[in-house]
Regions:
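Bacterial N-terminal signal peptides that target proteins for export
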Residues: 2-14
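Solenoid-like repeat scaffolds
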Residues: 36-42, 89-95, 127-136, 165-173, ...
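Generic helix N-cap/helix-start motif at coil->alpha-helix transitions
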Residues: 45-52, 96-103, 135-146, 171-181, ...
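Conserved small-residue packing positions in alpha-helical repeats and bundles
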Residues: 54, 69, 107, 148, ...
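Helix-turn-helix repeat elements of alpha-solenoid scaffolds
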Residues: 58-65, 69-86, 111-128, 149-164, ...
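Solenoidal tandem-repeat scaffolds enriched in leucines and small polar residues
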Residues: 166-277
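C-terminal structural cap/anchor segments
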Residues: 317-349
Length: 349
C-alpha cells in the first residue's frame, strides 16, 4: 500500500506540472484584464529597448518577429542578459510597473537557466513591486500562478497553497485546475479531508461550467476516499470511472472492491466485463475468471472462456488448465468435449 501511495504521489506531481505547463512560463508584457482598470505607470521607451536587448541575450527565439524572419543575434550570453537586468533594477527612478516588468523578465531568464530558487525569488519581487506601487493585474496573477506552480514542483506545498490563496483572491472566481492543485497539495501534506473538499469542488466547478471531468481529477477522489476508508464512495466513483474512462485498472479496482464487500455477483460481472472488452492478457486472469464462473455454477461459460484463452494462446496448455477445462465441460454435461479435454490433460501428466 505504501508503495502504491508513493507512486501516486509521484504521478500527482507529474500530472499537475503537465496540466499547468510550468515550462510555458512566459515573458510577454502583460496587459490589463477587463476589471476595474488600474492606473499603471508607463514604461519608458529607453528602458523597454534595454529590456529587449537583455531578452535577446536570454533567448533570441522568444522575441516577436514576422513569419520567416530570423531570430535577432544576441550581444551576450543569457547570464549577461540577467546581469544587465539586475543592474537596471538598481536604478532609483524606476516606477512600480517598470520594476515589476524587469523582475518578470529576470524570472524568465533564471527559468531559462533552470535556476528554480532564483526564478522564485524574481517572481516574489514582481509581487512585492505591486505591494508598494501599481502593477498590471495580469502580471501580478501570472507571477502568483508561477509561484504556486514552482513551489509545488519543489515540494513546498504549504508555500504553494499560500500563493494559490492570493491568486484566487485576485482572480475573483473559481478555477478547476487550481482547485485540483489545492487538492493534490493537501494530499501531499496528508490533509486528506481538506484535499477531498477541494477535489469535490473541482467537480462542482466543472459541472457549473458544463465541461467534462478530466480523468486524473476524478481519480483523485478515488484515492482520497480510499485514504479515508470510505469504501462505498470509492465504489461509487469507480462505477462512474469505468463508464467515462473504461480502463482495465479501474475495472480491476472495482471488481476487487466488490469482492472486498462480498458482493460476489457484482464482482463476477465486473471481471466478465473486463474479459468481454478484451482486456485480459495473462494466463492467471483468464483462469481466474473461468474458476469464478465455475464457482458461480455456470460451467459452460467457464469452459468457453478457458477454451478461447487456449485458442488465443493466452492460457498455457498444461495439465492443470486442461483438467479445469475438462471439469467445466463435465459439469456442463458436454461429455464429448469433456473426454477430449481429459485426454489432452493426460498427455501432460
Amino acid at each position: 500500500m505504501k508503495g502504491a501511495q508513493k507512486l501516486f504521489r509521484t504521478w500527482v506531481c507529474l500530472s499537475v506540472l503537465v496540466a499547468f505547463n510550468v515550462a510555458g512560463i512566459h515573458v510577454a508584457m502583460a496587459a490589463d484584464e477587463k476589471k476595474k482598470p488600474r492606473r499603471v505607470p508607463a514604461i519608458s521607451q529607453s528602458l523597454y529597448k534595454q529590456m529587449s536587448e537583455a531578452q535577446i541575450m536570454i533567448d533570441p527565439d522568444s522575441m516577436p518577429r514576422e513569419e520567416g524572419e530570423p531570430a535577432p543575434v544576441p550581444k551576450g550570453t543569457p547570464q549577461d542578459g540577467i546581469n544587465k537586468l539586475l543592474e537596471m533594477t538598481q536604478r532609483k527612478k524606476l516606477n512600480s510597473n517598470e520594476l515589476s516588468q524587469l523582475w518578470n523578465l529576470l524570472a524568465f531568464g533564471y527559468y531559462t537557466l533552470e535556476n528554480v530558487p532564483r526564478t522564485i525569488y524574481a517572481y516574489e519581487q514582481v509581487v512585492a513591486a505591486g505591494k508598494v506601487g501599481v502593477i498590471t493585474e495580469a502580471l501580478e496573477k501570472n507571477a502568483l500562478r508561477a509561484l504556486f506552480q514552482l513551489n509545488y514542483s519543489i515540494e513546498k506545498y504549504r508555500e504553494a497553497l499560500s500563493y494559490i490563496k492570493q491568486w484566487e483572491t485576485l482572480n475573483g472566481g473559481p478555477d478547476a485546475a487550481v482547485s485540483y492543485l489545492k487538492a493534490t497539495a493537501n494530499y501531499q501534506l496528508e490533509n486528506f479531508r481538506q484535499a477531498l473538499k477541494w477535489a469535490i469542488e473541482v467537480e462542482d466547478i466543472v459541472e457549473a461550467e458544463n465541461r467534462e471531468m478530466k480523468e486524473n481529477w476524478l481519480y483523485l477522489q478515488v484515492v482520497l476516499y480510499n485514504e479515508l476508508e470510505d469504501m462505498d464512495n470509492v465504489i461509487r466513483v469507480l462505477e462512474r470511472m469505468v463508464v467515462d474512462f473504461p480502463k482495465k485498472q479501474y475495472w480491476m479496482h472495482l471488481a476487487g472492491m466488490y469482492t472486498e464487500k462480498e458482493w460476489d455477483d457484482r464482482s463476477l460481472s465486473a471481471y466478465y466485463a473486463i474479459y468481454a472488452q478484451g482486456m485480459f492478457s495473462k494466463d492467471s486472469e483468464v483462469v481466474m475468471l473461468s474458476q469464478r464462473l465455475l464457482n458461480a455454477e455456470v460451467p459452460f461459460e467457464a469452459a468457453s472462456v478457458l477454451e478461447q484463452g487456449l485458442k488465443d494462446e493466452i492460457v498455457e496448455a498444461n495439465e492443470k488448465n486442461l483438467r479445469l477445462l475438462a471439469t467445466c465441460y463435465t459439469l456442463s454435461q458436454d461429455m464429448a468435449k469433456a473426454i477430449d479435454a481429459w485426454e489432452r490433460a493426460s498427455q501432460y501428466a
